[in-house]
Amino acid sequence: MNHAPHLYFAWQQLVEKSQLMLRLATEEQWDELIASEMAYVNAVQEIAHLTEEVDPSTTMQEQLRPMLRLILDNESKVKQLLQIRMDELAKLVGQSSVQKSVLSAYGDQGGFVLAPQDNLF
């Protein structure tokens, strides 16, 4: 059985999944991006399995090379966008920790509210 057409089709599907993931990351649809990740991983595993069964010809390798480049470029862009998002989340977590520390430090004032007085003289 000739698996070469199936291998080529599997690569096309991987390109589509890669483009979807890049679009989701660009649009900051993080939940959807995470949900689509498993389908992407499965597609990569299918290609690995098919590649074991098929020894792609030089011609087929030349046809697949641009797809591989596109997939790698998309993956790099997704990683960059994810890093930006992780930095944003780290900043928010840091701000939350500071707020918690401030509330903890000033919340233990024995029930007294510290406020400036209007007439100091």
Curated annotation (Swiss-Prot):
InterPro entries registered for this protein in UniProt: FliT (IPR008622)
GO cellular component, one term: cytosol
Signal sequence bounds: none
Primary localisation category: cytoplasm
Pfam families hit by this protein: FliT (PF05400)
Chain spans, region FliD binding: 60-98
Span list, region Required for homodimerization: 1-50
Keywords, alphabetical: Bacterial flagellum biogenesis, Chaperone, Cytoplasm, Repressor, Transcription, Transcription regulation
One record GO biological process: bacterial-type flagellum organization
Keyword Ribonucleoprotein included in the entry's annotation: no
Gene3D superfamilies according to UniProt: Flagellar protein flit (1.20.58.380)
Described purpose of this protein according to its UniProt entry: Dual-function protein that regulates the transcription of class 2 flagellar operons and that also acts as an export chaperone for the filament-capping protein FliD. As a transcriptional regulator, acts as an anti-FlhDC factor; it directly binds FlhC, thus inhibiting the binding of the FlhC/FlhD complex to class 2 promoters, resulting in decreased expression of class 2 flagellar operons. As a chaperone, effects FliD transition to the membrane by preventing its premature polymerization, and by directing it to the export apparatus.
Subunit-structure text: Homodimer. Interacts with FliD and FlhC.
Family stated for the protein in its record: Belongs to the FliT family.
Record's protein name: Flagellar protein FliT
Origin species: Escherichia coli (strain K12)
Gene coding for it: fliT
